[in-house]
């Protein structure tokens, strides 16, 4: 399943784009991913004359495959536990209020320092990053190889790939043909390279073999991929915060924005194509927030968390461990104290940063300048 020295299953499971999962399914660099993961790329290639979103797209030969500037496929070469290294470096920080222990910029600086500039220069396309797990209790360094020449091979029409649309999204069972196909290209040595007609299909270390036999009850099954993050360790106060602030703001603001988008999309086929990916991305998180709040209330999840906390307090008293209830009190106070700030932050993000597209221009300029 995992080996840093030899080809393993993890070499066939890739990060597609900014956060999706893909699977290498051929020795010629073919990548299988979701239709919704390839949706923005399909949209960028769509026009009124060639509406690939509506009609689908299939490259009949490799020279017909479509390049996608900005799209990447990332392979994980290895994962190292660097907890001791990070903790040693953190001890050098004298500011007691420092948040560096969770800072991506700081942690990635440590990653580059650990491997050295020569390693990165000798391995083109390789990047390293350190991620904090469990709120900074564990740290892992990921050594990644990132390919930027990724071409669209095929996608079904949205009537298949997006069947059920927003009505069926986040609902199960699903009946969607949610897939698209891309191909990763590399230089002649198999290294990452910018798009070039001279690039060749990447031969991955490992690719998945597809079975048409199907499965039966009690067959072994597993999932590998890049799911993002979990908030399963939220306290009851954080659960309420997610429901009453985070999700509430997202639902209210996105509902207004999506109504405006849809009105214009229905008027003009060109606008429909141009806004298809933005609308889909917005409605995806919108419906997730609605479903999350429904589940929190339906399952009485806040009370379930309260019960867990009460059991922890009872255990800590029995074991003479006062640090645990003290930590809970601290967390409760922090969540209560930040309510107004958190509401303002979510309103700023949803209503201004995401809601008014022109507001992104100064942000993008600032990013480029940095």
What are the functions of these language-model segments?
Residues 1-370:
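Terminal presequence/propeptide segments associated with secretion/organelle targeting
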